[in-house]
């Protein structure tokens, strides 16, 4: 453009034509009539920095949803193996829960003594219940699958951290 033309991006819903036979020419004439009458309002087009920020925040949202999905998948896997951590731990992905899951991924089961070692702070009030909730067992494939799920969760957290630094 040579600077003599003003471009307006308008919402199509704001320029509905009367029903009937439609052609591109009739639509163009109708839009020109609305524009001359001052009845078309341009849509908001954010600046380039705002558009970039929106891209990042949308991607951040999708990563957060991915993390939630991954956590649900891990919890379901643990429960299918007989580990009911979420019954007694408020956040199974907190310090205590994650330590127990890492141990399970390595060995496939956890002893009451190991539970004592991994359970921290507030969760200690429910220590006996937690010991009962972790009486399941994992075979080699289930342990490997848990390792993969935990690794994927960690990678998602790393991506989230990178995006948040950019935002």
Role assignments for model-derived ranges:
Residues 1-167:
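A detector of single, family-specific signature residues
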């Amino acid at each position: 453009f040579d600077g003599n033309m003003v471009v307006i991006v308008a919402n199509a819903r704001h320029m509905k034509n009367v029903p009937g036979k439609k052609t591109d020419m009739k639509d163009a004439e109708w839009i020109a009539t609305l524009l001359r009458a001052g009845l078309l309002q341009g849509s908001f087009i954010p600046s380039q920095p705002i558009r970039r920020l929106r891209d990042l925040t949308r991607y951040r949202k999708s990563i957060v949803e991915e993390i939630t999905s991954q956590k649900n998948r891990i919890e379901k896997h643990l429960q299918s193996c007989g580990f009911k951590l979420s019954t007694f731990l408020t956040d199974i992905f907190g310090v205590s829960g994650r330590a127990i899951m890492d141990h399970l991924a390595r060995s496939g089961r956890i002893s009451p003594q190991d539970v004592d070692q991994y359970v921290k702070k507030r969760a200690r009030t429910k220590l006996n219940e937690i010991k009962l909730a972790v009486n399941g067992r994992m075979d080699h494939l289930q342990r490997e699958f848990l390792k993969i799920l935990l690794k994927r969760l960690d990678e998602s957290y790393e991506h989230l951290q990178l995006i948040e630094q950019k935002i």
